[in-house]
């Protein structure tokens, strides 16, 4: 069900499917060329269109870049923390998006995701209430690899 919803969401936006792997999908945008693994939360406390993605932008030399869309807007100065197993990463964030502060952190996050079972993104909502979006990581390694291959052969 999650995979089907992911496919419909992404196909509706003109993306080319590269495969669906458990709760993660891999897709390619033709112009500008970029490929990504993407998933919706397995559990979320908000109501928005939350997702986590790991993107490759070949023309920009970007590989394995994390992007999180939060399920609700966060409080202006609230920290956003990504947890994978016992690893914790503080993310940079906008009102409803978060990302790693640098490529080294992206690399560490992706390595943790490949070995993890689940990850959660925690912060405070605009009203001050804590919330978390939780993602199952089964299939993430294969989806990331499929996205990398999808852009490598183009």
Where are the regions that the model predicts?
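A generic "folded-domain core" signal
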Residues: 11-154
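Hydrophobic h-region of N-terminal signal peptides that target proteins for export
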Residues: 2-13
């Amino acid at each position: 069900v999650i995979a089907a919803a992911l496919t419909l969401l992404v196909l509706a936006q003109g993306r080319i499917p590269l495969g669906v792997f458990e709760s993660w999908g891999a897709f390619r945008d033709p112009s500008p060329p970029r490929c990504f693994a993407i998933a919706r939360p397995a559990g979320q406390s908000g109501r928005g269109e939350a997702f986590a993605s790991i993107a490759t932008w070949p023309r920009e030399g970007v590989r394995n870049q994390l992007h999180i869309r939060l399920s609700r807007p966060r409080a202006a100065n609230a920290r956003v923390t990504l947890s994978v197993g016992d690893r914790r990463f503080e993310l940079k964030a906008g009102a409803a998006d978060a990302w790693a502060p640098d490529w080294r952190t992206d690399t560490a996050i992706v390595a943790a995701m490949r070995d993890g079972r689940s990850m959660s993104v925690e912060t405070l909502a605009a009203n001050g209430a804590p919330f978390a979006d939780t993602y199952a990581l089964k299939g993430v390694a294969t989806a990331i690899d499929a996205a990398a291959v999808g852009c490598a052969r183009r």
